[in-house]
């Protein structure tokens, strides 16, 4: 599901004239004498720009550090598992905050299973066996009929979490550098809306009214937006 939507966005952007460069790693952010964005250094060359939007999820802290900006983020591995394909038996998405697990079935028949974030800060992209075991125990407690299914693969991705569990969208102390991060595990669902207001923020060089409270300054002025209880999960 995620790959199909990502490719859909990519094709739509390509039709609008956007250049998408794959396997292009950002290695540095150059700033001018007044502290403004000047260029981006990558493993495929230097790109001059006066505006730079960073939407790097779990690696946002790494990228912003290149411009001298420290972010109030913690990055955790989040694991997912996929089972062998079976006929349609689960036409919905189930999530339990009691056992910290969720499960759905793809159109190929595979069960897609996930749980809470790992309990340690890491940029690891590999799944840990003890997390996998705990997740499967939780799913089988909810749905005993899945006990005989075999898992085909598992992996981990990085999610970025803020202290108040709300995203950061808007300006940074570096002129021309804009930030959209801190979504935890909710970023995919928020992509259409957050992309719209983030684009408006960059185009107008000022925060969109809907996301003005989600600025980076809230962590220094104390105007936090506590969403931990509303999310009911740690991420």
Task: Please give the residue ranges for each predicted region.
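Hydrophobic/aromatic beta-strand patches that form the interior of the parallel beta-sheet core
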Residues: 21, 53, 178-180
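Active-site catalytic microenvironments for nucleophilic, acid-base chemistry
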Residues: 12-16, 66, 201-205
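Active-site substrate-recognition segment that forms the wall
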Residues: 28-30, 36, 46-50, 54-175, ...
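Helical element adjacent to the flavin cofactor pocket in flavoenzyme catalytic cores
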Residues: 3-51
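C-terminal catalytic lobe of FAD-dependent flavoproteins
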Residues: 98, 140-235
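Short-chain dehydrogenase/reductase
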Residues: 6, 64, 199
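Mid-domain beta-loop-alpha active-site segment that forms a flexible
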Residues: 3-12, 57-59, 131-138, 187-190, ...
């Amino acid at each position: 599901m995620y790959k199909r939507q990502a490719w859909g966005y990519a094709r739509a952007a390509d039709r609008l004239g956007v250049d998408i460069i794959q396997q292009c790693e950002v290695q540095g952010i150059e700033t001018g004498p007044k502290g403004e964005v000047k260029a981006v250094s990558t493993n495929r060359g230097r790109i001059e720009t006066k505006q730079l939007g960073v939407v790097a999820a779990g690696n946002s802290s790494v990228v912003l550090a290149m411009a001298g900006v420290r972010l109030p983020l913690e990055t955790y591995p989040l694991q997912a598992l996929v089972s062998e394909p079976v006929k349609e038996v689960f036409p919905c998405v189930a999530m339990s905050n009691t056992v910290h697990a969720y499960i759905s079935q793809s159109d190929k028949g595979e069960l897609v299973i996930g749980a809470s974030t790992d309990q340690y800060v890491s940029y690891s992209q590999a799944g840990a066996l003890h997390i996998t075991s705990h997740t499967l125990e939780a799913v089988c407690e909810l749905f005993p009929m899945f006990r005989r299914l075999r898992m085909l693969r598992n992996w981990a991705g990085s999610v970025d979490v803020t202290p108040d569990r709300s995203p950061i969208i808007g300006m940074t102390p570096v002129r021309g550098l804009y930030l959209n991060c801190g979504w935890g595990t909710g970023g995919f669902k928020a992509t259409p809306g957050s992309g719209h207001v983030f684009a408006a923020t960059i185009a107008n060089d000022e925060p969109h009214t809907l996301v003005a409270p989600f600025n980076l300054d809230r962590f220094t002025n104390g105007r936090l937006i506590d969403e931990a209880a509303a999310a009911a999960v740690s991420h």
